[in-house]
Amino acid sequence: MLPDHPEMLAHRDMLSSMRASRGLFADAADRQRLSPACARAMRNIFREWRVPRHQAAAVLGVSLYTLNRIQNDNWRGCFSQDQLTRASLTLGIYGSLHSVFDQVLADQWIGLANSGPLFRGKRPIEFMISEGILGMYSVRRHLESLVQGY
């Protein structure tokens, strides 16, 4: 983990304040309603990114068994608050990638080694897996800064 990286510190503070309140996706009825659409979106994004299933499962915070059921359109469950947060971040990352890069690079970027200060040679997918939700927030914020031209 990169505890003193400014983006990680900012996201840690944001998560702490979210936990103090009910936070995103806290309502069970909302999670039940959103889960089917999120499952379809995750299935499509991970296919476009050509992410191995074990990595897709780790990013989404589900077991490989659950991910296989999602990929085969045979899952009727309900994502947890954590899993919906991960799905939301993944959707944001996907959208930002397609705003910044052409179709091919947008779908390859997640698996390419990145020498930038945030990633330090890691592939973004590896960074998100190793750093969890905080890492996913950092990737999304990084990409949003590219969209905005910073």
Predicted regions located by residue number:
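Non-transmembrane "mature" sequence context
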Residues: 1-150
